[in-house]
Amino acid sequence: YTACYEVTKDVLARGYRNIAYMADPPIYRPGCDRLRGFRDACKEFGVTVPQENIFLAPIEDTKPLNAFLHDVARRDVPPKAIINFVRGWDYTMLQALHSAGLRVPEDVYLTGLDDDNTLPNFGYSMQYLPSTIDFSETAAKLLIERVEAGNALPEPERRIFTTHMKPVFERKVTLPKPDAAPTETDEKEK
């Protein structure tokens, strides 16, 4: 919830209103939480994103997602920001935008999950906390506790992580002109 809420809030605070959102469908818990975070941030800014700019589909459903990306990129007025919470679609998004003659980040600001680590090529990245190392250390400690317990297994323990995500600009980048007046953001661009 939190990571998607923060990313959406950042996009809206930058003044973008013509945006697209991609994520797993709400039949999966992460998809449900992310959609709620997206909607809550939009509600906070009084923004309604048209349904044709929202795509909710599992990763396995490649044809509709490809069609959505190519449709969005080729519109007369394409979105100025795309919030992506579908894992592993960074290169496909770049290919769809490039084939339509759009530049990142000058024409379209991409944000959200960056599994392929492509955004640093454009002068910014997404800081996602807690890191994979934090998750791995917690899982390893729980596993060691179970192994060391022998036959007397410890009580199952549930750890809840609150994720956070924000853009980090490594250099001065030119983002698309906003649709509305920007508001104050937490991020200080270099």
Role assignments for model-derived ranges:
Residues 69-189:
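Flexible loop/turn connectors
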Residues 1-6, 22-68, 83-91, 113-116, ...:
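Hinge/beta->alpha junction and helix N-cap segments in small-molecule ligand-binding domains
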Residues 17-18, 49-53, 103-109:
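Short acidic capping loops at alpha-helix termini that bridge into adjacent secondary structure
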Residues 17, 24, 32, 51, ...:
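A generic "cationic amphipathic patch" detector
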